[in-house]
């Protein structure tokens, strides 16, 4: 949660340094992808699921060309999406990608990671996860957190000077 609060403070232009402590993969990965969109989901339950996240302001900070981060969820036993105005959860991966939900925040509820989005809540349960660029290069969570922290520090400095992006 420390990273989430620091990123939110920086986004709001609040003074103070951004501190980074290692957090578990879930829910940290979804918190760092704040404002990113789930563009596509592939795989099967139970099994390995790949979630394609488009988040331009972070992706462009990597030298390799591409548009997405791919979050791989091995041994995934649950992935569903409940629209705020829907009755039944969406479990069809193509339909979930069609909604293109934007990630806001995430929290753990037992073994389930709840990812709160602009139009609903995605719930997932997986033993672990990994991140790679759409070029195939693996990105350790620590590297992604470092890149995100640098982005928000720069954003905060620009906003203090009256020059937000």
Q: Where do the model's predicted regions map?
A:
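Surface-exposed, interaction-prone regions used to assemble/regulate multi-protein complexes
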Residues: 2-165
């Amino acid at each position: 949660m420390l990273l989430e609060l620091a990123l939110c403070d920086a986004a709001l232009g609040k003074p103070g340094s951004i501190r980074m402590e290692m957090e578990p993969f879930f829910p940290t990965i979804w918190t760092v992808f704040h404002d990113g969109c789930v563009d596509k989901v592939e795989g099967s339950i139970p099994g390995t699921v790949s979630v394609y996240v488009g988040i331009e302001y972070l992706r462009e900070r990597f030298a390799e060309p591409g548009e997405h981060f791919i979050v791989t969820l091995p041994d995934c036993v649950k992935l569903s999406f409940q629209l705020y105005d829907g009755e039944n959860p969406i479990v069809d991966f193509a339909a979930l990608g069609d909604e293109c939900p934007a990630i806001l925040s995430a929290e753990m509820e037992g073994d389930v990671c709840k990812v709160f989005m602009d139009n609903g809540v995605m719930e997932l349960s997986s033993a672990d996860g990994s991140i790679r660029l759409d070029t195939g290069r693996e990105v350790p969570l620590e590297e992604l957190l470092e890149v995100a922290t640098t982005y928000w520090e720069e954003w905060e400095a620009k906003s203090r000077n009256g020059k937000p992006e």
